[in-house]
Amino acid sequence: MKLIEPRNLKGFRDYLPKDQIPRSIIFSKIKGVFERFGFEPLETPVLEYADILAGKYGVEGEKLMYRFKDNGERDVAMRYDLTVPLARVAAQYQNELPKPFKRYQIAPVWRAENTQKGRYREFYQCDVDVVGSAVGIADAECVAMVEEIFFELGIKKFVIKINNRKILNAIMLTAGVSEEKILDAIRAVDKLEKVGPKEVASELKEKAGLNSKQAEQLITLASTKISDINALKTFVEENILKQPQAEQGFEELNSVFVALKAFGVKNALIDLSLARGLDYYTSTIFETIITETEDSKKYGSVAGGGRYDQLIKLFTGKDIPAVGISIGIDRLFAAMQDLGLIQNKGIVSVLILNLEESLQKEYLKMLSALRKAGINAELFYSLADIKKQFAFAESKSIPYGVLLGLDEAKKQAVTLRNLETRKQKTIKQKSLLKELQKLLK
């Protein structure tokens, strides 16, 4: 018989317990903050009709979609993000959902992109969105929530960059970009931090039809450092006020920052070069970068999103405002590993060692009592060398071991061992539960 080589597709991976346990802890903390902010869970299918997803992500995003014909010759695609499926849900169930509708979803998405550290073709997103609320508090709440999540995960240094697509559009028009080329110019500017001004200028000339002077002006305007909302007002008045969207963009961003100040958010700043490459953004956009690492570009954006007031209209024919933000858990996890924030923690608290054949019933009774008391416990299934059983406990990061041999059984006692410090003490069997509950608080 020819053996099948066990292997993964490029960009896809397994999560063994040593990785999945801390990931689950991170998911749980994120979910806790989501629910604290009033967001409710939603699940959507992996597969959607291709026309639901197509045309929402721009030319480059379209190339990354996993799209194929299923067994019924239907044109289908695997979800590229969680936002467009939400837009479909908001339209499909618009008469059943509360208004505004605040939802979160934690699920994998698929993109056929180049792989690198922290970037995969299958990866999880943690999304929150508010459907049915105009620009202002809802946008600020998304930002405040991300800040709280990062603090809760132990990340101290990060920035949440914020911009407004209307202001960015006004910059584009001021520099000479035509209306029909704005999205092409936005996709170019979106790469400014990754590839630098020279490459962006080249793409602006090639894709957006600008000459060298116009490209330079656009990059200069978009690279202007804005210290606060008052500085933004001055920038708008001095540079782009002639464009019809400029004033509205400023007023929208101002309303967001008024709410952010009330929320007490400290890590948000205005970045006029922030573009976000997806086509459906219409107003506020955000992006979060971890700055604790030596190279803040290493993982790219670990959280990003924005307002998409016209996306749901594609399904309903009417404007329904919406805003959301997504956390890329794989990039976040990779960064947290480098920062030493991932604890090697198991889910089992106690291992009962298997030392005597004649004591099997006692082991099982003890195991059952611990579990019924809410303690995660397991028994080493077979008789084995004690060193082997300790090694098993260490491999699973189990903190405590319970030893019951013939001598302890005669005295109705057990030995409770701290498997990390190797300190142990003998206690009465009836005291074991109370002792463990005290240690595991």
PLM-predicted stretches and their roles:
Residues 22-37, 48-49, 72, 83-94, ...:
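Positively charged, Gly/Ser-enriched RNA/tRNA-binding surfaces
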Residues 42, 46-76:
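Polyanion/phosphate-binding surface patch
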Residues 120-126, 162-170:
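Short, conserved phosphate-binding/catalytic loop or strand-edge motifs used
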